Amino acid sequence: MPGLWRQRLPSAWALLLLPFLPLLMPAAPAAHRGSYKPVIVVHGLFDSSYSFRHLLDYINETHTGTVVTVLDLFDGRESLRPLWEQVQGFREAVVPIMEKAPEGVHLICYSQGGLVCRALLSVMDNHNVDSFISLSSPQMGQYGDTDYLKWLFPTSMRSNLYRVCYSPWGQEFSICNYWHDPHHDDLYLNASSFLALINGERDHPNATAWRKNFLRVGRLVLIGGPDDGVITPWQSSFFGFYDANETVLEMEEQPVYLRDSFGLKTLLARGAIVRCPMAGISHTTWHSNRTLYDTCIEPWLS
């Protein structure tokens, strides 16, 4: 009997320890695949999906398993096509992605792409965007000489470009769709076929529906900085812009905010606007700067 007891003792102890085995064993690494919302990336002017290879690497490193789609549409010179045409093309591309992601998606939209994405959020009545990350985008328009403009309109300067952009011919170019001359506000309001509409600055029959759609977004993350060198004024990335004297008025001083014409004031009131300014970054390096990614983008990719 004593020998039999000694033989059975380990088995008895094993039975007693079974409930505690999970505590005694090392924890397995958490499985990330499938736990993060898909990310959709929209490029900017004269850009392509290749420009975002660093950003793609950063996301894969920090949020392993995230499905990231860098949309390869309207690349290079095709990015000059009218923005409403681009909105339609990108809409057809994002709908299937959203339909496969019932928990929602994130949008990272760079430069001109930020305006495309804001229009998408306005016209899509069933979008499920959680974080809309606007990366150095001229959200309140552009009023500055850049190499792009000098190449496209070599005989025009900033002060007289309105003559081109506020014509039916000019509105066929994406850049002119958000050209915002503070010295010719009436012409801008009457001629702008894109920015004045998504801003709710000009009455149109879809204004109420677009505002409701835009407010479906979970969070609006605004990124930009004083050393951008292209977005003019750089505060346009944060919905600031020039007045008639070229003094920058911040977002809270803008008529579109005060009237809450497309939902900015409502978003801010519910704590859904994140502003992340960062100095020392030029326009073409926003999407490859690791510090910027860690500080301003990664925290919002849940």
From Swiss-Prot:
Source organism, top-level taxon: Eukaryota
Catalytic activity: hexadecanoyl-CoA + H2O = hexadecanoate + CoA + H(+); S-hexadecanoyl-N-acetylcysteamine + H2O = N-acetylcysteamine + hexadecanoate + H(+)
Disulfide bonds: C109-C117, C165-C176, C276-C296
Signal peptide: 1-27
Observed effect of gene inactivation: Mice are healthy at birth, but develop neuronal abnormalities, infiltration of bone marrow by macrophages and multinucleated giant cells, and splenomegaly caused by extramedullary hematopoiesis. Autofluorescent storage material is present in many cell types, particularly reticuloendothelial cells and neurons.
The keyword Signal is annotated on this UniProt entry: yes
Enzyme class of the recorded protein, top EC level: hydrolase
Subcellular location field: Lysosome
GO molecular function: fatty acyl-CoA hydrolase activity; palmitoyl hydrolase activity; thiolester hydrolase activity
Keywords: Disulfide bond, Glycoprotein, Hydrolase, Lysosome, Signal
Residue numbers annotated as active site: S111 (nucleophile), D228, H283
A GO-annotated cellular component: lysosome
InterPro entries linked to this entry: AB_hydrolase_fold, Palm_thioest
Tissue specificity comment: Expressed throughout the brain, primarily in neurons, and at lower levels in glial cells.
Pfam families, per database record: Palm_thioest
EC number(s) per entry: 3.1.2.2
Function summary: Catalyzes the cleavage of thioester bonds from S-palmitoyl-CoA or S-palmitoyl-N-acetylcysteamine (unbranched structures) but does not have activity against palmitoylcysteine or palmitoylated proteins, branched structures or bulky head groups. Conversely, hydrolyzes both long and short chain fatty acyl-CoA substrate.
Family: Belongs to the palmitoyl-protein thioesterase family.
Identification of the protein by name: Lysosomal thioesterase PPT2
Species in which this protein is naturally found: Mus musculus (Mouse)
Gene: Ppt2
